Amino acid sequence: MLDKLSKHKTMFYERVKEIDQILFSQQQAKQTQLDNLSNNNASGGFFSGFMKMFSPLSTPPNSSSNNNSNTQQAISQETRKLCSVNNNRHEPIYNQYTTNSQVIRSFPAVSSIGQSSTNMYNSVNICDGISSSEKRSPTPPRNRSNSNDKILFGHYDALGSLPQNNMGHYQQPPQQSSQQQQQPLVPKQNSVTALRNTTSATSSTTTANNKKPSLDQIPELKGVDRKLLDHILNEVIETKTTNWDDIAGLKDAKQTLLETVILPSIRPDLFNGLRAPCRGILLFGPPGTGKTMIARACASQCNATFFSISAGSLVSKYHGEGEKLVRCLFAAARYLQPSVIFIDEIDSILSARSSEEHEASRRMKTEFMIQMDGVSNMNGKEDRVLVMGATNIPTELDEAILRRFTKRIYIPLPDHAARASLIKQLSHGQNMSLSETDINKICVATEGFSGSDLTALCKETSMVPLREISMDQLISIDARKIRPIVLKDFQSSLVHVRPSTSQDTIKKLEKWNESYGTFAKGI
């Protein structure tokens, strides 16, 4: 079957080539005759002879006075196809054929580049119907999610938006100027997505001035290494809105954060000069008391960019790269302001300096303190960047760091009312049968528990009704037939779940709070 098809293709190819050669020969002959007639100097000789040869409606030379009107008749359509008045001709059709003996056909086409129509030949493969001029690189998938291509290269969003030709294939849209295709490198809006697109630009991308894209075009990011900036942007957390109601208790801490963080963002005209908001807030207290959630709530209420930094974010194996990461962190925070830089377990990064520590750690701490003071900010404006640190061991922090954290807020263990509120929040939507008296009894029994300890207790209690059911019944039982959780289940779970913070740790933290802590003062 394939041999027959190949044979027919070859025969058809030869036949088309012969026809084209005949047409080309006729064109040459007609052109020669036309040139000979043009040399005739007799009055009306050119048109009368021309119409005699090509037009069936022409009259003999010896006819009446209708010769003048006949000589002004238009050239026939057949003559227009075979010859050209301006002595220009098209190249033979077979010169455009492919060399692999493909079955092809030729037809006059119109240029699709937005210019005037041109009578040009366009070779088309009959087997697959794809024009050779339309062969291009594979079209990207319909659903494109890479915003970097849309911003820096100006690619088209989807294949479905492209027009179709008469063969049912997609056509490339008209080419636009480089100024319309290329978007400016510097983002118009200081968003994390736009900044990530800028850092992911390849070296082959060029701007309107044929220069490689550089972060130096952004004043806040001048001199920042692209790879380090991309590493810092990975620490940005984009979470759902966290409200103050999600945090149980901590009335004094909420009041202090309200006047130092939330109100200055709402009324910046009132908080300037001596009322200017502080640059650093230290949250210290036992583990599991919600220090991270408080920082997220502050960033959410201020609509700020939230950087979650740990020791691994600023420590590098390369010599001298730690301080560069610190500088890059504050540069990105200033560009994306308002920003909140939250450093969990800050004592692991900014501990007290000593002569035995490594030189790289000392330089990194020094750079952090310089950036936190804002010495490198030369624009004269107040940066809306807040540094929040959380630690369980505030005694390990360097004194110079403590000076920069002007607000040091103690986050204690939840009291009786806070534990009751937290238990109600955790039991919301669960099958629990607890009265107010039962909740009070649970709060009394959980004295010294942190928020994470109470969460672990509730999870352990929720498994008690399931353990009473055999494995065979548990596979097929209806969830609505499982009995609710009662006070007895909490009492049995208290045997397995114990508080994680010792009383000695609580006393040390309370003593440090009396010496260095900040107490809330109501407005």
Swiss-Prot record:
The family database entries (SMART domains) matched by this protein are listed as:
AAA
Q: Which Enzyme Commission number(s) are on file for it?
A: 5.6.1.1
**What InterPro entries does the annotation carry?**
AAA+_ATPase, AAA_lid_3, ATPase_AAA_core, ATPase_AAA_CS, MT-severing_AAA_ATPase, P-loop_NTPase, Spast_Vps4_C
Q: Which UniProt keywords apply?
A: Allosteric enzyme, ATP-binding, Isomerase, Membrane, Microtubule, Nucleotide-binding
The answer, when asked if Oxidoreductase is one of the entry's keywords, is: no
Q: Where in the cell is it found?
A: Membrane
Q: Name one GO cellular component term.
A: cytoplasm
> This protein is called what?
Spastin
**Which species is listed as the source?**
Naegleria gruberi (Amoeba)
